[in-house]
């Protein structure tokens, strides 16, 4: 049997790794940001402490109830990034990852074709991107005040709740910190930026301008007039009117009969005088 390792390196490149290609993958086939890096470029920093993006976790391994939100301050208490802290920029429920401002940062070269405005030097710009940190490696920082009244941030633990609306903290007893001032405020949601007006968008003055006023002399008729006409000229109202009129007529006839019967009874009961039939 022929050894395939002697044939594949001619197409794949030197070495015994069959999956290592001689040429890098095209940009549209790359799946990780770090594949855009050129290690030979001195302008790109290679921070060994920075970790790549976290993999997608299974649904059973994902955090069911999140208690860390965008805008909170967190502290990395374990892992290679232990000791760093910052503000939460983004959360990812699929990877259980938290993006912290200024933590786990890596410099990445961005291709020009991905930018709307090309740079003047026609070179790929290098930007710093913060990568994710696992949810289990961080701890929330609560607001507190020292004995001198200065604001500080201290790491706290949370009580377990089966809801994201409840965030009860366990207040630690730290020397020099007023324990009654320890609190964990809910971060304020940032207002979403308004979309810029486009060239084909209808302006507000045009939308609010009154271009039609209802009139009874010109079509179309206003809604209230149509409703009145429909109510007054409907067949259902004609039937109701006839039914009421018949009831009224029957009532009047019954009253007349009662009056006639009463008058007849009174006439019968009335005594007859002797002069009534006199000649």
UniProtKB/Swiss-Prot annotation:
Mitochondrion as UniProt keyword: yes
Subcellular location per the Swiss-Prot or TrEMBL entry: Mitochondrion
Residue numbers spanned by region Disordered: 34-56, 185-204
Residues annotated as domain KOW: 70-100
Subunit structure comment from the entry: Component of the mitochondrial large ribosomal subunit (mt-LSU). Mature yeast 74S mitochondrial ribosomes consist of a small (37S) and a large (54S) subunit. The 37S small subunit contains a 15S ribosomal RNA (15S mt-rRNA) and at least 32 different proteins. The 54S large subunit contains a 21S rRNA (21S mt-rRNA) and at least 45 different proteins. uL24m forms the wall of the exit tunnel.
PANTHER family membership: MITOCHONDRIAL RIBOSOMAL PROTEIN L24
Record function comment: Component of the mitochondrial ribosome (mitoribosome), a dedicated translation machinery responsible for the synthesis of mitochondrial genome-encoded proteins, including at least some of the essential transmembrane subunits of the mitochondrial respiratory chain. The mitoribosomes are attached to the mitochondrial inner membrane and translation products are cotranslationally integrated into the membrane.
Protein name per the record: Large ribosomal subunit protein uL24m
